[in-house]
Each structure stands twice: as structure tokens, then as C-alpha cells.
Amino acid sequence: MSGLKAGDSFPADVVFSYIPWTEEKGEITSCGIPINYYASKEWADKKVILFALPGAFTPVCSARHVPEYIERLPEIRAKGVDVVAVLAYNDAFVMSAWGKANGVKNDDILFLSDPEAKFSKSIGWADEEGRTKRYAIVLDHGKVTYAALEPAKNHLEFSSAETVIKHL
């Protein structure tokens, strides 16, 4: 498959790895237990922003991409978005720690792992090193309403919160 585009259905049986946020496991040094997150099922009746990036704790991802979504979360919620999720090839432990390092609580933004970039590879949006590329997908009740892949690893425009908000 060569990416997703507006009008496509979100693929069936998409499963990510995820550690849910809990108060007792809220410290960055605490460790939760990964679970399967059945995205296709969970998002079937919701409005969702899924944005992906090459890796947790990396320069563009940590300095600009994630912080912009955190900052603009109230605006995103006001537009009727039920779920905001960030995706990378890192394992669920790293993604959980990255969410905590960014001060995200109560699953305000889901920090999901795409093990071996399986989903990203399935849509043709993984790089030659096996990492998720930088992209954004907006879903509304299982239908893609916006999908964009950045042209380069350090490019941040089409998957930015600012651009995605314009497409809600």
C-alpha cells in the first residue's frame, strides 16, 4: 500500500502496543505493563488524530512535534477530537516514559508503539531503517479525512498540529 488518503477506510485489525497512564505509575521511573491497543476497534466510532514520528526523545520530535500537540490540545478537543495519539517504532516502555517526560497525564495523548513499524510499513510510511516516518492521519468514525506524509525526516509541516487543526 502506498499511504492512506482522504476517503479511505482505516485498515482493519490494527494493533499497537501501549502502557496506559495511571496515577500510581505516573513517575518516569515507574514501569507499567504493555497491553495490546486495538486501534481499529477503539477508533471505529471516534474522531482521532494519529501522528507518527521517527522516534521518541529525538530532536524535532521532542522539541517541536509533540510539544505543539500538547500545547494545542484544548483547541483540538474543542474541534470534537476524541483521541490524540502519537506513534513511533520505539517499544511501549520508551513511549510511556516519553509521555511522562512530557508531563502528559490521564491519557490526554496516547503514546503508542508501532512494534517493528508494522502498521507504518503496511501503509508504506516506514523508512529504510525500519522506523516510522513522520506523518499524520485524521479519522472520523473509521474513515480517513486527512493523511499526509512529510517529505523528509526532519521536515515538520503537514503533520504539525497547526496544519492538522486546519483539516478538522
From Swiss-Prot:
It is an enzyme of class 1 (oxidoreductase). InterPro entries: PRX5-like (IPR037944), Redoxin (IPR013740), Thioredoxin-like_sf (IPR036249), Thioredoxin_domain (IPR013766). Keywords: Antioxidant, Disulfide bond, Oxidoreductase, Peroxidase, Redox-active center, Stress response. Induction: Down-regulated when grown with elevated levels of potassium chloride. Induced under oxidative stress conditions dependent on transcription factor napA. The keyword Oxidoreductase applies. It catalyses: a hydroperoxide + [thioredoxin]-dithiol = an alcohol + [thioredoxin]-disulfide + H2O. It comes from the Eukaryota. Its EC number is 1.11.1.24. GO terms for cellular component: cytoplasm; extracellular region; mitochondrion; peroxisome. CDD domains: PRX5_like. It holds the Pfam family Redoxin. The active site is at residue 61. Residues 4-158 form the Thioredoxin domain. Gene3D superfamilies: Glutaredoxin. GO terms for molecular function: thioredoxin peroxidase activity. Belongs to the peroxiredoxin family. Prx5 subfamily. Homodimer; disulfide-linked, upon oxidation. Interacts with thioredoxin trxA. Thiol-specific peroxidase that catalyzes the reduction of hydrogen peroxide and organic hydroperoxides to water and alcohols, respectively. Plays a role in cell protection against oxidative stress by detoxifying peroxides and as sensor of hydrogen peroxide-mediated signaling events. Involved in osmoadaptation. The active site is a conserved redox-active cysteine residue, the peroxidatic cysteine (C(P)), which makes the nucleophilic attack on the peroxide substrate. The peroxide oxidizes the C(P)-SH to cysteine sulfenic acid (C(P)-SOH), which then reacts with another cysteine residue, the resolving cysteine (C(R)), to form a disulfide bridge. The disulfide is subsequently reduced by an appropriate electron donor to complete the catalytic cycle. In this typical 2-Cys Prx, C(R) is provided by the other dimeric subunit to form an intersubunit disulfide. This is Putative peroxiredoxin prxA. It comes from Emericella nidulans (strain FGSC A4 / ATCC 38163 / CBS 112.46 / NRRL 194 / M139) (Aspergillus nidulans).
